[in-house]
């Protein structure tokens, strides 16, 4: 039987070699060279985080809050480098989430993983 950690490292290597990761890395490197773009993304992510925190605390997230974030996204996405970065980041995050789901589902660990196990 193979060591699960060795397999995890193989998966990490495969992910690093994927087109999705390479696309993300190239987009990130482009953004990191421009302080204005970095700041725009940082501001957007901060607002996105604040909205998610509100939601998690059970506070009301108004349609105005959502609209404001959507407007900000539309504005910053007019820059092709930012749009490419956010798109590549979203695709990579989806792959990682899919991998986590595949693992959790295959070992029937989903409920335990998220704290919903029957006691």
Curated annotation (Swiss-Prot):
It comes from the Bacteria. Belongs to the UPF0342 family. This is UPF0342 protein Athe_0692. The lineage of its organism: Bacteria, Bacillati, Bacillota, Bacillota incertae sedis, Caldicellulosiruptorales.
């Amino acid at each position: 039987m193979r060591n699960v950690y060795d397999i995890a490292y193989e998966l990490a290597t495969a992910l690093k070699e994927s087109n999705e990761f390479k696309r993300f890395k190239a987009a990130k490197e482009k953004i990191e060279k421009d302080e204005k773009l970095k700041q725009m993304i940082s501001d957007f992510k901060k607002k996105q985080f604040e909205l998610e925190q509100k939601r998690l605390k059970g506070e009301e997230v108004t349609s105005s809050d959502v609209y404001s974030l959507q407007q900000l996204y539309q504005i910053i996405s007019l820059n092709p480098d930012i749009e490419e970065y956010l798109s590549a980041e979203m695709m990579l995050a989806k792959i990682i989430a899919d991998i986590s789901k595949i693992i959790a589902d295959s070992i029937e660990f989903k409920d335990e993983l998220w704290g919903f196990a029957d006691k």
